[in-house]
Curated annotation (Swiss-Prot):
UniProt KW Isomerase keyword: yes
Gene encoding the protein: rbsD
Name of this chain's protein: D-ribose pyranase
Positions of substrate binding: D28, H98, Y120, A121, N122
Biological processes per GO annotation: D-ribose catabolic process
SUPFAM superfamilies according to UniProt: RbsD-like
Pathway: Carbohydrate metabolism; D-ribose degradation; D-ribose 5-phosphate from beta-D-ribopyranose: step 1/2
The UniProt record lists the keyword Kinase: no
Subunit architecture: Homodecamer.
Subcellular localization(s) per the UniProt record: Cytoplasm
GO cellular component: cytosol
Lineage: Bacteria, Bacillati, Bacillota, Clostridia, Eubacteriales
GO molecular function: D-ribose pyranase activity; intramolecular lyase activity; monosaccharide binding
Amino acid sequence: MKKTPLLNSSICEVVSKMGHTDMIAIGDSGLPIPDDTKRIDLALIKGVPTFMQTLKAVLLEQQVEEVIIAHETKEVSPETFENIKKEIGDVKITFISHEELKKELSNCKAVIRTGEQTPYANIILKSGVVF
């Protein structure tokens, strides 16, 4: 049995196959996911699981060197943005428009859909290296 806390086999599989600068996204329940991008749907009911619960779990498993966030997250959902900053520490933050973020999803290895109902609670995690 796994020793690390993350149990979701789909997320573990994607993260284990990621190389340097590969990307995975975590989104709220309304984020449109491109048909050709792997969807890991965790949404159970409204609000479950939350965006932050999911981000915390993925960060236990993945080395991240940069995150990509929409400008709108900071402007419309400042509490979510502050929580993200607390969780990622010194990781570089790149801001793009929400429309650009949606386009960037097609370059992600997977998009994790949560039950989150907060507007613009979306993030792209760019993989770092552990050495």
